[in-house]
Regions:
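Glutamine-centric residue-chemistry signal
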Residues: 22-24, 74, 105
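Structural signature of Gram-negative outer-membrane beta-barrels, strongest in the C-terminal barrel
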Residues: 97-113, 117-136
C-alpha cells in the first residue's frame, strides 16, 4: 500500500514538473482528438429544404516551436472526416444525400500562449491549412431510384454521374483555442474551407440537374482534448 501511494505521488509530481518544464521548452509535441461537427452548406440548383449537421472525426499530432516569449509557430498532420448532409427535393419526394470525405490535412499556425501558473496556461492560434482527400463516398437515400446506394465519388461520380465529382484538395483557414492543465489540454476550434469541392461537367451529363447541387465548401468546428509531451 505504501509503495502504491509513493508511486501515485511520484506520477502527480512528474505531471506537475512536466507542465513547468514545458513552459520553458523551445518546442512542444502534441496529440489530440475531437468529434468534428460539419456545417458545410450545399448551394443548389433546386430547392433544398434543410442542411443538416454532419458529425465526423478529427485526429491530430504536431509540434509547436517557440519564436518569442509568448509567440509560437505550429504545424503537424491531421486526419479528418468532413462532409455534408442535406435533404433533396425531387418529383418522387424527399431524400437525404450524405457526402463523406476523409482528409489528410497540414496546418501552419501562428499562436500566442499565456502561462497563468506554472501548470495552467491558455493559447490561441490561427493560420492556413492544406488538405488532400484520401477517399470519399456519397450515400443516396430513397430519392432518384427509390433505393439506397453508395458511390465512390472519384470513380463513379456523385450518385453515379460521371460529370459530377469532388476535388481531392482543399485550402482554408483554421483557428483554435486551448486551455492547458499540466500535460493535458482542452481545445475548441474551427476549419473554414475556401475551395468549392464540387467539380461539375454539365455538358457531358445532362442528368446533373437531378443532383440539384452546384457548390460545396467545407466548414466545421470541434471540441476535444489533447496531450503534450
Amino acid at each position: 500500500m505504501t509503495r502504491l501511494r509513493t508511486l501515485l505521488l511520484s506520477l502527480v509530481a512528474l505531471c506537475a514538473l512536466g507542465g513547468t518544464a514545458q513552459a520553458q521548452m523551445p518546442l512542444r509535441i502534441y496529440v489530440d482528438a475531437a468529434p468534428l461537427f460539419n456545417l458545410s452548406h450545399a448551394k443548389t440548383l433546386q430547392d433544398v429544404s434543410e442542411n443538416k449537421l454532419f458529425v465526423g472525426y478529427r485526429l491530430g499530432a504536431g509540434v509547436d516551436v517557440n519564436v518569442g516569449k509568448m509567440m509560437y509557430i505550429g504545424s503537424g498532420l491531421t486526419f479528418a472526416m468532413k462532409g455534408n448532409q442535406y435533404t433533396f427535393l425531387s418529383p418522387k419526394g424527399e431524400g437525404d444525400i450524405k457526402i463523406y470525405s476523409h482528409y489528410m490535412q497540414i496546418p501552419i499556425n501562428v499562436g500566442v500562449r499565456l502561462n497563468l501558473t506554472p501548470t495552467i496556461g491558455a493559447s490561441v492560434e490561427a493560420g492556413p491549412y492544406f488538405a488532400y482527400a484520401l477517399g470519399a463516398t456519397v450515400s443516396q437515400g430513397k430519392i432518384l431510384d427509390d433505393i439506397q446506394k453508395t458511390y465512390n465519388v472519384y470513380k463513379d461520380g456523385i450518385l453515379g454521374m460521371d460529370g459530377a465529382k469532388l476535388k481531392r484538395y482543399d485550402i482554408g483557414l483554421v483557428a483554435k483555442a486551448k486551455v492547458t492543465f499540466g500535460s493535458w489540454y482542452g481545445m475548441v476550434g474551427a476549419d473554414m474551407g475556401f475551395v468549392d469541392e464540387l467539380k461539375l461537367d454539365e455538358k457531358n451529363d445532362p442528368e446533373l440537374e437531378k443532383l440539384g447541387q452546384k457548390a460545396m465548401r467545407n466548414t466545421s468546428f470541434y471540441l476535444g482534448a489533447g496531450f503534450t509531451f
